């Protein structure tokens, strides 16, 4: 990890802070995230399998990507519904579901123009219809929203990329390309720079398991918003993987551009690895010499794919997928810090996100994506994570002192004013019980206040799952509790 990954972290002027009083709907137990040295993290919201509140109706096989708008306020998830007769497309509905990156609540649905899949008629008058549109989504450095068409065989079926206007759903095609002599499925893509009006490139890797076509990464370069002819350097052949037991990109491969010379690839049988544009490894977890240290930092298993890196306050970080649904942390990611050169060998664990994983999720599309929005002025990085079929979760990360000011209800864990807080929340049948007198507010999972009581050690409630805010002696505790 050599340089800041400009394609994965947006630099913002301001990040909006949630001013809602009381516990946040879907917020994790804050005690899971103690401060790490002078840094802390604040879970904004979570709607995912392990929390039991995964409520996104569109998450499924055809909602495989996620992106964040350039201003950091919106989470975008594409969705398609293809209607086929005798395995031939007859119609398609392409949508971008827009959620608040601050609260996770759905805000609107953008119906994308049918021009994205209906390309008119050919010379014989037959309709030209494309399936598999909107298989992935990205936002480039200029804030352009891009949708990707999956090619199941790029030798005969074009990979396509479309710029989408979120106001009216209109589209502009910036790529429709086949590659003669190459067979391969290209599910997802990455973007660097401004590919609509400026300079940059698109990058996509085969999701093939064979050794002949399954090691290919393709690049499409843009100058002044104009697609350039591909040359030999744009057809990249991967020469090695980590772990070395991997023999191809295989399924659901994700690529993440760093700059003109470097990109990350996270593949089905290999871990997130930094590559040169000639397909050789620039850096990997193999550079961590001590085996125990390496095992503590590298993924528990391959399979789920996603990686990003960013800098905040002069410190470099990376966040990457570490597990599948059957690992100790089920479907999780890891946030680490790095040295100035961003070398794998310098990685130090900061947090696992979510701390207990997103859950036991069947995810054949292999999507577990981190997206990061950085606001240097505020001293905050907002990390949003999306798991195909499994949900999403968001965090604010930064100096603990900054987080405490932005989120007054944040619970510092450990020593506070040279005292250790002893307030805890438990339950008995029909009651929420406090270990000492405190003011208590109880909310249901929809954020509705159920009961509020001052200076008490218990409140009576009906059986169910509740979010509890309790406060005494200046300490604030937010947690979840199940009452029988």
PLM features: residue spans?
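Hydrophobic h-region of N-terminal signal peptides that target proteins for export
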Residues: 9-18
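Surface-exposed loop and turn segments in beta-propeller and other repeat-based domains
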Residues: 23-58, 107-130, 170-192, 226-249, ...
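Signature of short aromatic-glycine-proline-rich micro-motifs recurring in repeat-based ectodomains
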Residues: 48-68, 120-138, 147-151, 179-208, ...
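Short coil/turn segments that connect the beta-strands within blades of beta-propeller domains
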Residues: 71-73, 142-144, 198-200, 259-261, ...
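Short glycine/acidic-enriched loop and turn motifs that connect beta-strands
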Residues: 80-90, 151-157, 207-213, 269-271, ...
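Beta-propeller blade signature
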Residues: 91-104, 157-169, 214-225, 331-338, ...
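Loop/turn-rich, solvent-exposed surfaces of beta-rich toroidal or solenoidal domains
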Residues: 270, 290-351
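C-terminal outer-membrane/trafficking sorting elements
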Residues: 414-484
């Amino acid at each position: 990890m050599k340089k800041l990954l400009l394609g994965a972290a947006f630099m913002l002027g301001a990040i909006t802070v949630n001013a809602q009083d009381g516990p946040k709907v879907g917020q994790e137990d804050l005690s899971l995230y103690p401060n790490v040295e002078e840094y802390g993290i604040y879970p904004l919201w979570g709607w995912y399998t392990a929390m039991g509140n995964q409520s996104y109706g569109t998450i499924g096989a055809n909602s495989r990507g996620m992106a964040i708008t350039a201003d950091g306020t919106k989470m975008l998830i594409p969705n398609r519904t293809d209607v086929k007769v005798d395995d031939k497309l007859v119609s398609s509905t392409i949508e971008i579901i827009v959620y608040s990156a601050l609260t996770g609540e759905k805000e609107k649905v953008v119906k994308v123009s049918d021009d994205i899949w209906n390309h008119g008629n050919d010379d014989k008058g037959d309709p030209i219809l494309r399936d598999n549109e909107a298989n992935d989504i990205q936002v480039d450095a200029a804030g352009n929203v891009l949708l990707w068409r999956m090619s199941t065989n790029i030798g005969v079926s074009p990979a396509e990329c479309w710029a989408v206007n979120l106001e009216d759903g209109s589209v502009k095609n910036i790529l429709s390309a086949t590659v003669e002599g190459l067979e391969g499925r290209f599910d997802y893509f990455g973007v660097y720079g401004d590919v609509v009006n400026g300079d940059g490139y698109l990058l996509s890797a085969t999701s093939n398991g064979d050794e002949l076509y399954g090691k290919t990464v393709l690049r499409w370069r843009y100058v002044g918003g104009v697609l350039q002819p591909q040359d030999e350097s744009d057809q990249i052949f991967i020469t090695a993987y980590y772990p070395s037991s991997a023999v191809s990109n295989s399924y659901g491969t994700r690529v993440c551009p760093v700059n003109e010379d470097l990109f990350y690839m996270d593949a089905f049988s290999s871990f997130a690895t930094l590559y040169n544009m000639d397909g050789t490894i620039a850096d990997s977890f193999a550079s961590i010499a001590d085996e125990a240290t390496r095992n503590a930092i590298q993924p528990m298993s391959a399979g789920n794919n996603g990686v990003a890196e960013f800098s905040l306050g002069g410190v470099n970080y990376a966040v990457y997928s570490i597990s599948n649904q059957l690992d100790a942390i089920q479907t999780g990611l890891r946030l680490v810090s790095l040295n100035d050169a961003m070398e794998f060998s310098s990685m130090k664990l900061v947090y696992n996100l979510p701390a207990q994983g997103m859950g036991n999720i069947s995810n054949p599309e292999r999507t577990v994506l981190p997206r990061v929005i950085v606001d240097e002025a505020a001293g905050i990085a907002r990390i949003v994570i999306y798991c195909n079929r499994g949900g999403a979760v968001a965090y604010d990360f930064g100096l603990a002192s900054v987080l405490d000011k932005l989120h007054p209800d944040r619970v510092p864990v450990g020593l506070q004013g040279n005292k250790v807080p002893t307030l805890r929340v438990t339950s008995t049948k029909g009651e929420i019980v406090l270990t000492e007198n405190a003011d208590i507010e109880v909310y249901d999972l929809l954020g509705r206040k159920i009961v509020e009581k001052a200076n008490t050690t218990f409140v009576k409630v009906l059986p169910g799952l509740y979010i509890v805010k309790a406060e005494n002696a200046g300490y604030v505790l937010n947690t979840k509790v199940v009452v029988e």
